[in-house]
């Protein structure tokens, strides 16, 4: 398949620059794969489309303030954006400026430095964080790396709303955005209906914003990301399936995590790239946001629901002035 087949026209003003407040006030488009119907609703009414015994699987990763500002030994200012978690004190990073070489030490603060270990490719490096408890130092000195297409600086609202309410495991540099719509009030409504919850961890990397640059979509590769699927989550998934109920993945990160090692507890790395033709073994339904044209995420949802149906839904979303991307509205695919 050609990448042009995953393109669509999006007016700039439909890119959501700020989050919906409250979270559950975002709009919800409901796609039914069986009858190819499209309905329009609001996220607070999500329980109306789920059944008692269905299982919602969330990504509990926590976005770290991965944008760091420091100085080289010469005194020159430099920006470091941590892009890929390797371990708490080791990351891949984008570093701006010239003369960035292995051995360079960038001072973020007297108690926090970044050492360049290896040049990976143009502008990208492997780095070591120097200081006690690096994740705490990132929290102290870093800035939230809001998506580049927002075209604005980080604001206080982003510290709250670019994080899910169940964010727990530090390591993501981008939010698992489908989960941003869930408020305490919505979770209570879901519990009252008998909907069950489970969690995985996938540390979303900066690669989530990477456009597909190859002509044939089958040749694209996604960056490896750290994933952990606990035994308890696998057991809940199996129980749900045995009862004939649905496993609902909240976000493309959860889809990729669950389909990497179906029905197995797992901790490691996934570079699973899902495109049309993929056979889904675990996921029965999916909640997701509206994705960028020509992106691996749009290709993934097309694999799940069919390219033509998805593009028809996107055209309708544009007509009805839905809000797009990370802070935008959402979609439930049944």
Curated annotation (Swiss-Prot):
Top-rank taxon, per record: Bacteria
Primary subcellular site in the record, as a coarse category: cytoplasm
Enzyme class, UniProt record, top EC level: transferase
Subcellular locations according to the entry: Cytoplasm
Keyword Cytoplasm: yes
Assigned EC number: 2.4.99.17
Name assigned to this protein: S-adenosylmethionine:tRNA ribosyltransferase-isomerase
Biological process according to GO: queuosine biosynthetic process; tRNA wobble guanine modification
Gene Ontology molecular-function annotations: S-adenosylmethionine:tRNA ribosyltransferase-isomerase activity
Keyword Aminoacyl-tRNA synthetase belongs to the record: no
Subunit: Monomer.
Pathway in which this enzyme or protein is active: tRNA modification; tRNA-queuosine biosynthesis
InterPro entries noted in UniProt: QueA, QueA_dom1, QueA_dom2, QueA_sf
Reaction equation(s) it catalyzes: 7-aminomethyl-7-carbaguanosine(34) in tRNA + S-adenosyl-L-methionine = epoxyqueuosine(34) in tRNA + adenine + L-methionine + 2 H(+)
HAMAP family noted in UniProt: QueA
Lineage: Bacteria, Pseudomonadati, Aquificota, Aquificia, Aquificales
Role: Transfers and isomerizes the ribose moiety from AdoMet to the 7-aminomethyl group of 7-deazaguanine (preQ1-tRNA) to give epoxyqueuosine (oQ-tRNA).
UniProt GO cellular component terms: cytoplasm
Keywords recorded for this protein, A-Z: Cytoplasm, Queuosine biosynthesis, S-adenosyl-L-methionine, Transferase
NCBIfam families: PRK00147.1, queA
Family: Belongs to the QueA family.
């Amino acid at each position: 398949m050609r990448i042009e087949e995953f393109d669509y026209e999006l007016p700039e003003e439909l890119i959501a620059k700020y989050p919906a407040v409250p979270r559950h006030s975002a709009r919800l488009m409901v796609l039914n794969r069986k009858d190819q119907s499209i309905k329009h609703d609001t996220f607070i009414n999500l329980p109306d489309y789920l059944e008692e015994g269905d299982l919602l699987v969330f990504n509990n990763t926590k976005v770290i303030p991965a944008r760091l500002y420091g100085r080289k030994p010469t005194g020159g200012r430099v920006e470091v954006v941590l892009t890929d978690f390797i371990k708490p004190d080791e990351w891949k990073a984008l570093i701006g400026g010239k003369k960035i070489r292995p051995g360079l030490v960038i001072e973020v603060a007297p108690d926090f430095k970044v050492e360049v270990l290896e040049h990976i490719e143009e502008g990208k490096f492997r780095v070591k964080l120097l200081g006690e408890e690096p994740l705490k130092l990132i929290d102290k000195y870093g800035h939230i790396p809001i998506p580049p297409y927002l075209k604005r600086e980080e604001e206080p609202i982003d510290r709250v709303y670019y994080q899910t309410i169940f964010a727990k495991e530090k390591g993501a540099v981008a939010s698992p955005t489908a989960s941003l719509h869930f408020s305490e009030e919505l979770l209570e409504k879901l519990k009252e209906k008998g909907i069950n919850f489970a969690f995985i961890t996938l540390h979303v990397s900066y690669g989530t914003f990477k456009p597909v640059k190859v002509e044939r979509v089958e040749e694209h590769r996604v960056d490896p990301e750290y994933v952990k699927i606990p035994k308890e989550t696998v057991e809940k998934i199996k129980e749900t399936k045995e009862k004939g109920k649905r496993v609902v993945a909240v976000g493309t990160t959860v889809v990729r995590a669950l389909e990497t090692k179906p029905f197995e507890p797992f901790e490691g790395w996934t570079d699973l790239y899902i495109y049309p033709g993929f056979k889904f073994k675990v996921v029965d339904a999916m909640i997701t946001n509206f994705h960028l044209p020509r992106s691996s995420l749009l290709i993934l949802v097309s694999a799940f629901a069919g390219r033509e149906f998805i593009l028809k839904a996107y055209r309708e979303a544009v007509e009805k002035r839905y809000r797009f991307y990370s802070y935008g509205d959402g979609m439930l695919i049944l």
